[in-house]
């Protein structure tokens, strides 16, 4: 079968890899270079963790995700993942922490509850002030995202995927599995896959309101030299205090410390200027002030803007439309599942998986005891 994929980010590349392995002839269209620095998935790191609050469906999917990443590491010949563990902090009774603990109990995932003093003692890069409760899990870690994307591009090219960079799609016809390029060229296939990230509503207006482009700013920090050894044992941090909370990514494999908040801007133009003003970078860094010990000793390196594609309930949209599949598994938590979603799509295309079941699974809505 001839398959045409729009978008060469992590989802498009994982779909291409899985469909190629299924024996299909795959063409990949990308509006920019490949990898595209403006893609949602092209950054130093992304996180994988079981901690999902009450969302047991997504927590269950993480085990599958780890298996699929292992398959990819074998194909790549390198493991682009660093285990860090996961630390949740928040005020006493924080719903995210209590719900995560209940889900972990149900799924048999190892964790320990910590108090503020224990957090500061075990992980001296983090400050104890303001912590009412904490949960630490040894599972979870950092996916080296930009290196993964480059590796997937190499695999796709070596496997025979036709990659067309610098090709902007003007219109999509899912019923005919056809696209019209900005220069007027028509490209058709037997099956169309649209993995266009924040550009999806422009290509398919029916998704206006179902997903919204959201400009997000992260700050990248250089830790003080005296804390570098402590950072080597520090877990990723998800903090739910102070309103919208913050995240902190350890400086894995030579990358900086990364931080930002959990809020969605729900604004911005993905074709707009990606430059981050110094004050915006400082604001993103400040989200971690309450949680990073000796915060003022960190040096702000830069800020970076990327775009999430946010659904109102933060559930992934993976669904067939005519002779096309729409892949919009984002809302800021999709990267970890990309190889699994690519595999599941290939199974559905081969008739081995029910499309409706796949859509429910991707939305995190499968029963917790489903096999």
Regions found by a protein language model. Name each.
Residues 21-41:
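Glycine-rich FAD pyrophosphate-binding loop
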Residues 6, 29, 187-199, 342:
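Short hydrophobic core segments
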């Amino acid at each position: 079968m001839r398959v045409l994929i729009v978008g060469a980010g992590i989802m498009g590349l994982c779909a291409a890899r899985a469909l190629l392995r299924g024996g299909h002839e795959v063409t990949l269209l990308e509006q920019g270079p490949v990898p595209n620095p403006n893609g949602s998935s092209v950054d130093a790191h992304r996180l994988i963790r079981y901690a999902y609050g009450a969302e047991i469906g997504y927590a269950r999917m993480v085990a599958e995700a780890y298996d699929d990443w292992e398959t990819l590491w074998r194909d790549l010949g390198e493991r682009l993942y660093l285990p860090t563990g996961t630390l949740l902090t928040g005020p006493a009774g924080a719903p995210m922490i209590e719900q995560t603990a209940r889900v972990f109990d149900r799924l048999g995932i190892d964790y320990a509850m910590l108090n503020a003093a224990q957090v500061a003692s075990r992980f001296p890069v983090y400050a104890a002030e303001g912590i009412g409760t904490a949960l630490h899990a040894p599972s979870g870690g950092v996916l080296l995202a930009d290196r993964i994307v480059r590796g997937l591009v190499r695999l796709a090219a070596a496997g025979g995927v036709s990659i067309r960079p610098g090709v902007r799609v003007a219109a999509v016809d899912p019923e005919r599995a056809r696209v019209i390029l900005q220069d007027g060229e028509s490209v058709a296939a037997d099956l169309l896959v649209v993995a266009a990230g924040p550009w999806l509503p422009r290509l398919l207006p029916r998704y206006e309101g179902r997903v919204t482009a959201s400009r997000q700013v992260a700050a990248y920090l250089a830790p003080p030299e005296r804390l570098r050894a402590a950072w080597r044992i520090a877990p990723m941090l998800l903090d739910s205090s102070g309103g919208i909370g913050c995240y902190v990514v350890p400086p894995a494999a030579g990358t900086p410390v990364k931080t930002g908040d959990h809020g969605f801007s729900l604004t911005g133009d993905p074709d707009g200027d990606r430059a981050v003003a110094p004050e915006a970078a400082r604001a993103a860094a400040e989200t971690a002030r309450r949680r990073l010990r000796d915060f003022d000793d960190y040096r702000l390196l830069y800020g970076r803007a990327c775009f999430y594609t946010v659904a109102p309930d933060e559930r992934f949209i993976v669904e067939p439309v005519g002779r096309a599949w729409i892949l919009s598994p984002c809302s800021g938590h999709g990267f970890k599942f990309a190889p699994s979603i690519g595999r599941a799509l290939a199974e559905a295309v081969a008739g081995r998986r029910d499309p409706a079941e796949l859509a429910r699974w991707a939305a995190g809505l499968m029963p917790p005891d489903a096999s």
